[in-house]
Amino acid sequence: KDYAENWGNHYALPRPKTPEEKQKEKERQAQLGLPTFRYHPTPLETGAFEESPDGVVCDCCGKTTHIFYTGPFYAVEDIEYLCPECISSGEAARKYDGCFQDDCSLDNGVDDPEKLDELIHRTPGYSGWQQEYWRAHCGDYCAYLGHVGARELRALGVLEEVLDDPMWDDEQKKMIQESVNGGHLQCYLFQCLHCGKHLLWMDFD
């Protein structure tokens, strides 16, 4: 437990962002020409997108891109790089008959097929230790915010909030309270787009 409270790492989310900071991040993404992803609003911060001064060639459109995706993409062909535009438009998923999130690894409670389509075909995924899982709340999929441990959850002031979740039993709640970002048990933070509640997923290496 002491280790969890006293050690951090490069994944850390140090504190909640102010509205001004959120606006600056939106402006930076707009300057870079990044599309807006409802279910993954800060893909550069979470590491879903990487940046390269030299650029790489998008496998889908064949154009050089300085921002690219190398995360999970479930398709028959082995895809190395995808640009943000080909993900946002759905072209990458169409061209390769692929998806960025397994549609069997999602919370129940979302009945709108358009929302499912947006999540699995037009939203960059995230990399977990095991099979990535996407949380839902208020009849919609949540926004993915990044990797966290107990230290980050305390800094954000949401530790008690994420523990208030029928998903977790008492033993699992204790594990979350002692989790270390980047450790053997990894937590992934989500936020409801409608009521703002924070939710977790966790897995083991």
Model-derived features: where do they sit?
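Preference for intrinsically disordered or flexible, low-complexity segments
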Residues: W7-D205
